[in-house]
Curated annotation (Swiss-Prot):
Residues that, per the record, bind Mg(2+) 1: D34, D88, E160, E162
Region (Disordered): 371-610
Name this protein carries in UniProt: Flap endonuclease 1
Basic and acidic residues compositional bias, start-end: 413-493, 502-526, 535-548, 587-603
Family in the record: Belongs to the XPG/RAD2 endonuclease family. FEN1 subfamily.
Composition-biased stretches (Low complexity): 549-584
InterPro entries assigned: 5-3_exonuclease (IPR002421), 5-3_exonuclease_C_sf (IPR036279), Flap_endonuc (IPR023426), HhH2 (IPR008918), PIN-like_dom_sf (IPR029060), XPG-I_dom (IPR006086), XPG/Rad2 (IPR006084), XPG_CS (IPR019974)
PTM statement from Swiss-Prot or TrEMBL: Phosphorylated. Phosphorylation upon DNA damage induces relocalization to the nuclear plasma.
Function: Structure-specific nuclease with 5'-flap endonuclease and 5'-3' exonuclease activities involved in DNA replication and repair. During DNA replication, cleaves the 5'-overhanging flap structure that is generated by displacement synthesis when DNA polymerase encounters the 5'-end of a downstream Okazaki fragment. It enters the flap from the 5'-end and then tracks to cleave the flap base, leaving a nick for ligation. Also involved in the long patch base excision repair (LP-BER) pathway, by cleaving within the apurinic/apyrimidinic (AP) site-terminated flap.
Organism: Plasmodium falciparum (isolate 3D7)
Originating gene: FEN1
Any one GO BP annotation for this protein: base-excision repair
Assembly and binders: Interacts with PCNA1 and PCNA2. Three molecules of FEN1 bind to one PCNA trimer with each molecule binding to one PCNA monomer. PCNA stimulates the nuclease activity without altering cleavage specificity.
Stored CDD domains: H3TH_FEN1-Euk (cd09907), PIN_FEN1 (cd09867)
Binding site for DNA: R47, R72, E160, G244, D246
Length: 672
């Protein structure tokens, strides 16, 4: 019968614990099936449609349970399930009163069935015939023989089949329990499957348009039930006893809802009985709830060591003889069953992916060894641990002991220890020794840890200082190298500029520098003339200037055409024409100076020696370039213009050879 209203209450209070699954989801799973419940279903379901009687052989023996058990087992195996059938043993003593009640109900149903047959009421016949069904021992033995010939394992429980199935799931020998009795959850089955038998043999859940639709089954998870109801296993057992079970009577007026509220408030049946209203809720005089609790917690089941589950090959010849000769089954039907059985056994040999990928909860010895090695090789963490109050007290105690040992000496300590050991008992000696060893070990470990930490800190500080010194040296070397590179670059630039504008080199810039030097020398000579010749020199110098201006005017008039031609020609031709003109002017100026000079030609301070300076040549060259009468202001302007040209040439003039005519024409004559 199970627990009254349990599945309905679970569906309402803990809906996550119940779910519908397909039979394909159980592929490769071992399912423990309540055999007596299955046989009861077969005898009720498989009947003659005319008289609603059982299928029988020639001798009148019932064969409904054999045909139903064989067809269902083959269908489960075809879907990949591995069934294990568990048969009931002797009923427990607590169930005696329940069995008496069932016997009385069966007698009443037989009386009603006789009346329905006399009246010809088919609906009443069908209803009452199901209540009169009873599975006999002979039928159980016939079912056991059939399953052994098919190679399917069976287990004979010493007591209840539901309790044995539940413990198979606890032993991890089965995945779930297939039964209609909800008391399998109270025995502790992990997963309960309902409607497996009905759905596996009927077509009621198939869709006409889609015949390949899988069967829908109901699965109840005990762990989710306890979470949803927020109960412990002991509280859940007391709750089921209050709802109504096969092992004791129930308290009148208490259903599943009130039982749940009372358990949540008082946690156990004893407190409920003490605090319950006896007038409202009548407790039975023989309320054996404690014995029922024990039977649920410690049922009479086979231990794990005594359980043997063997999957054997089917005995085909013996199976044929058993079905055809003993129970008059059709031979074609039997051969069809056997062929299906052989194919189904190949399907059951397939394994699930869960079997290949199982979770390992224990660490292997290799992992443990590797972890210990890593912990030993790991460097100590930076910084010191903050000592706690206990550590400080231990350190103080260690220091005191050391001071006392140094003061008294090792010999006195030994004598005191001997006297103390003689006075104490053996138990006291052991306790003291253990405490001393622990304190000594701890103190030594603390000292070692402190020394290790200090050494590590010193080594780290040294390494940091070395790294800082190395970084400073590297920075100094880099700065020195940078300064050297800068000095080398400056020197190279100075050399480059000196090469470009060196007076000794044959370049236009060199000639400009020479001319500037000559101008500076001429200015010095002009400044020194008054000191050498006095006022007379000034007169002569002015006369010389006048003569030079007259010569310049004449030459400008006579040679204007030639100079214009020279300007239009190349730069090199202009240089040659100017040189000839300078030579002529030089001769004329020399004559005038000779005639007017009162000094001797041989005197070292004579004007004839000074006239050989490049002063006149420089002046004449400037006259040719400017073509204007030269005065002191004009000379200053010329000097300023030369300085401006000098600055411009520093930035504009490239380096090129003096005699450009001798250089061959190429695409790249010379790069600047």
């Amino acid at each position: 019968m199970g627990i009254k209203g349990l599945t309905k209450f679970i569906a309402d209070a803990a809906p996550n614990a119940i779910k519908e699954i397909k039979i394909e989801s159980l592929m490769g799973r071992i399912i423990a099936i309540d055999a007596s419940m299955s046989l009861y279903q077969f005898i009720i379901a498989i009947r003659d449609s005319e008289q609603y009687g059982n299928l029988t052989n020639e001798s009148g023996e019932t064969t409904s349970h054999i045909s139903g058990l064989m067809s269902r087992s083959i269908r489960l195996m075809e879907n990949g399930l591995k069934p294990i059938y568990v048969f009931d043993g002797a009923p427990p003593e607590l169930k005696g009163s329940e069995l008496e009640k069932r016997g009385e109900k069966r007698q009443k149903a037989e009386e009603l069935l006789k009346k329905a047959k006399e009246e010809g009421n088919l609906e009443e016949i069908k209803k009452q015939s199901g209540r009169t069904v009873r599975v006999t021992r002979k039928q159980n033995e016939e079912a056991k023989k059939l399953l052994t010939l098919m190679g399917i394992p069976i287990i004979e429980a010493p007591c209840e089949a539901e309790s044995q199935c539940a413990f198979l799931t606890k032993y991890n020998l089965a995945h779930a329990t297939a039964t209609e009795d909800a008391d399998a959850l109270v025995f502790g089955t992990k997963i309960l499957i309902r409607n497996l038998n009905a759905n596996a043999t009927s077509n009621q859940n198939k869709n006409k348009n889609n015949s390949k639709r899988g069967y829908i089954l109901t699965e109840i998870n005990l762990e989710q039930v306890l979470k949803g109801l927020n109960l412990t296993m002991d509280e859940f057992i007391d709750f089921c006893i209050l709802c109504g079970c096969d092992y004791c009577d129930t308290i009148k007026g208490i259903g599943s809802k009130t039982a749940y509220n009372l358990i949540k408030e008082y946690n156990c049946i004893e407190k409920i009985i003490e605090n319950i209203d006896q007038n409202k809720y009548q407790v039975p005089s023989n309320f054996r709830f404690q014995e029922a609790r024990k039977s649920f917690i410690n049922p009479n089941v086979l231990p794990k060591e005594d359980i043997k589950i063997d999957w054997n090959e089917p005995q085909i010849e013996e199976l044929k003889h058993f079905l055809i000769k003993d129970y008059n089954f059709n031979e074609l039907r039997v051969t069809n069953y056997i062929n299906r059985l052989l194919k189904a056994r190949k399907v059951t040999t397939q394994r699930r992916l869960d079997n290949f990928f199982t979770a390992c909860t224990k660490k292997s010895t290799k992992l443990i060894v590797e972890e210990t090695k890593k912990e030993q090789t790991l460097p100590a963490r930076k910084g010191k641990k903050r000592p706690t109050a206990g550590d400080k007290n231990k350190q103080k105690a260690v220091k005191r002991k050391i001071e006392q040992a140094n003061a008294n000496g090792h010999h006195k300590m030994k004598e005191e220890n001997k006297s103390v050991d003689n006075e104490k008992n053996e138990d006291g000696i052991k306790s003291v020794d253990n405490e001393k060893n622990e304190d000594g070990i701890k103190s030594v470990d603390d000292e070692k840890n402190l020394d290790d930490e200090k050494n590590l800190d010193d080594e780290k500080n040294k390494d940091d200082e070395k790294n800082k010194d190395d970084e400073k040296n590297k920075d100094d070397e880099k700065n020195k190298d940078d300064e050297k590179n800068k000095d080398d670059e400056k020197k190279s630039l100075d050399n480059f500029s000196s090469n470009l504008f060196d007076s000794d080199k044959e370049s236009e810039s060199g000639n400009i520098i020479k001319n500037e030097k000559q101008n500076m020398d001429d200015e010095k000579i002009n400044d020194n003339l008054p000191s050498l010749f006095g006022d007379h020199s000034r007169i002569r110098h002015t006369e010389n200037k006048d003569n030079i201006s007259d010569i310049n005017n004449n030459n400008n008039n006579n040679n204007s055409s030639s100079n214009n031609n020279n300007i239009s020609n190349n730069h090199f031709n202009s240089v040659s024409s100017n040189s000839t003109f300078n030579s002529s002017t030089k001769l004329k100026s020399e004559d005038t100076l000779k005639s007017n000079s009162p000094l001797k030609e041989d005197s070292p301070n004579s004007y004839n020696n000074i006239k050989n300076n490049n002063h006149t040549i420089n002046i004449n060259s400037q006259i040719n370039n400017h073509k204007e009468p030269i005065s002191n202001n004009n000379l200053n302007n010329i000097n300023n213009s030369t300085e401006i040209k000098k600055k411009n040439t520093l930035f504009l003039l490239p380096f090129c050879p003096k005699d450009v005519t001798n250089v061959k024409k190429k695409k790249y004559t010379q790069r600047c």
